[in-house]
Amino acid sequence: FYAFSGHKIYAAPGTGVLYGKRKWLDAMPPYMGGGEMIATVRFSGTTYAPIPEKFEAGTQNIAGIPTFVPAIRMAENMRSPEIVSYADDVKKFLYERLSEDDRITIYGRPDNLDLKIPLFSVSVRKAHHEDLAMVLDKMGIAVRSGQMCAEPMMDRFGVTGMLRMSLAPYNTMEEAEYFVQSLDKAIKMVSQ
């Protein structure tokens, strides 16, 4: 199986793709019921619609689905050499600045920064990730805070959660610098 979430490329939440071999999809029972997924219902049993309908209970995401194709096109356009080069420069700048701060632990340090996706998961000594996220939000910066659906990983690193920042291809060097300055201010505010 392959699964892909549309919101990872800026499509609306609840969009995506599930790809599986027909023999497995045919053999799998639906995990929900309702809507057009049922062909017939009798006291003797239920016959499900063919795939993919048998897995599509209820009303489809009619507001989100139209965002999926434009998001794919935008993602394709973001692969131009100029955009990739600039985004890599922003990523490297942010990584270097975060690495210089001895209060910050970066998880997943890469051997080759060129291969690293533009996402940084960090913890900050004497500052709770949720407090930092709240202060950064007040500064106009969106980050993710918590266990990132990966509680065993948090246990492995001995933390209750992390702060995660993700860069987009349209983020600027100025925004990365603003983030570094704002994170420094937030750390000072919540660690006192």
Question: Where are the predicted features?
Answer:
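Pyridoxal 5′-phosphate
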Residues: 1-192
